[in-house]
Amino acid sequence: MVTKEQRRQKIKARVRGKISGTQERPRLTVFRSNKQIYAQLIDDIAGRTLASASSLKLEMTGSKKEIAAKVGDEIAKAATEAGISTVVFDRNGYLFHGRIKELADAARKGGLKF
């Protein structure tokens, strides 16, 4: 029987074969744990993280969805400071629902295009 984590890893590998981030259009990847949420802008060609934001770093309070939205705002601010306006969104095998969707919507409102 395939567990949820094995299913996610399979989807993640399939999607990562198709998308890649560059300096001009980095990959916005999201990692979700039970308590925290993390977002990174990655240049896959150089293998560098250009910007990052997380609920752990910001020490926020509120519901998990509210925190995800704040992390989305923070990654959008970090991207604009780095001169990035368009990204490739990598949901990392998670469903585009709940906290992932809140983070993506907040990043879009913050000025990122994907």
Curated annotation (Swiss-Prot):
GO terms for cellular component: cytosolic large ribosomal subunit. It holds the Pfam family Ribosomal_L18p. GO terms for biological process: translation. InterPro entries: Ribosomal_uL18_bac-type, Ribosomal_uL18_bac/euk. GO terms for molecular function: 5S rRNA binding; structural constituent of ribosome. Keywords: Ribonucleoprotein, Ribosomal protein, RNA-binding, rRNA-binding. This is one of the proteins that bind and probably mediate the attachment of the 5S RNA into the large ribosomal subunit, where it forms part of the central protuberance. NCBIfam families: L18_bact (TIGR00060). Belongs to the universal ribosomal protein uL18 family. Part of the 50S ribosomal subunit; part of the 5S rRNA/L5/L18/L25 subcomplex. Contacts the 5S and 23S rRNAs. This is Large ribosomal subunit protein uL18. It comes from Porphyromonas gingivalis (strain ATCC 33277 / DSM 20709 / CIP 103683 / JCM 12257 / NCTC 11834 / 2561). The gene is rplR.
